[in-house]
A protein has these predicted regions:
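Residue-level signal for the short linker/turn that defines the boundary of a DNA-recognition helix
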Residues: 8, 19-20, 46-49
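Short amphipathic recognition helices of helix-turn-helix/homeodomain-type DNA-binding modules
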Residues: 64-70
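The alpha-helix within a helix-turn-helix
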Residues: 14, 26, 55
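Residues within the helices of the helix-turn-helix
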Residues: 11-12, 23, 52
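Short alpha-helical DNA-recognition segment
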Residues: 19-38
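Residue-level detection of the helix-turn-helix DNA-binding "recognition helix"
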Residues: 15, 30, 41, 70
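A short, Lys/Arg-rich alpha-helix, primarily the initiator
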Residues: 1-18
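DNA major-groove recognition helix of helix-turn-helix/homeodomain DNA-binding modules
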Residues: 49-64
Length: 70
């Protein structure tokens, strides 16, 4: 079984969402700025609920924001 990892475009979509800050996104999602920073850096994989909330706040489908890569 090959090792896959979760990648994301949170930073890109956050910037395109009127240059939303990490703090603003975190507040709307219900997590800290540090959590958003860790997700963007690929150091933390969000829960499924958190991933859906991020996509919803950014106004994008989940698959536009998060990708499962080999």
């Amino acid at each position: 079984m090959s090792k896959k990892r979760l990648s994301n475009q949170v930073k890109t979509w956050r910037f395109l969402a009127q240059e939303m800050t990490q703090s603003e996104l975190g507040e709307k999602v219900g997590v800290t700025r540090q959590t958003i920073a860790a997700i963007e850096a690929g150091k933390y994989s969000p829960s499924l609920e958190c991933a859906f909330r991020i996509a919803e706040v950014l106004g994008r489908p989940l698959e536009d924001v998060f990708q499962w890569e080999a």
